Amino acid sequence: MKINYQSLEKKIDLKFKNKDLLVQALTHKSFNPNENYEKIEFLGDRVLGLVIAKKLLEIYPEEKEGILDKKFASLVNKKTCLDIAKKINLASYVKTFNPNNKKIKIEDKIISDSCEALIGAIYPVSYTHLTLPTILLV
């Protein structure tokens, strides 16, 4: 089954020069134990945290740190990533090992992790601006 990554690029309004990075960001370790999204997900989690922290400081410049921390925690979590991933139907782009080659439902954790990995893959494209495509922001 061939995956149309161009349709994902269109959804997030971002064109990847390095398609291999995009493919790796959407590859689960069950499909490829060596080139998968785990390290890119690690980066994506940090990028997401930094972008959200920066945005919260812009929106609430006078707010106390404790309140900002609560707002941050409500935004940077697996459920938020899952909601974003569902909004762009990210599961349809994720490669997982499927021994029977049948359509299967991908676990929510894999979808959420893939969203963080996608954010990690976006970082090299937009790191000078520390922004994410609007579709990925809640």
Regions found by a protein language model. Give the residues of each.
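Single conserved hydrophobic/aromatic residue that forms the stacking wall/gate
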Residues: 129-138
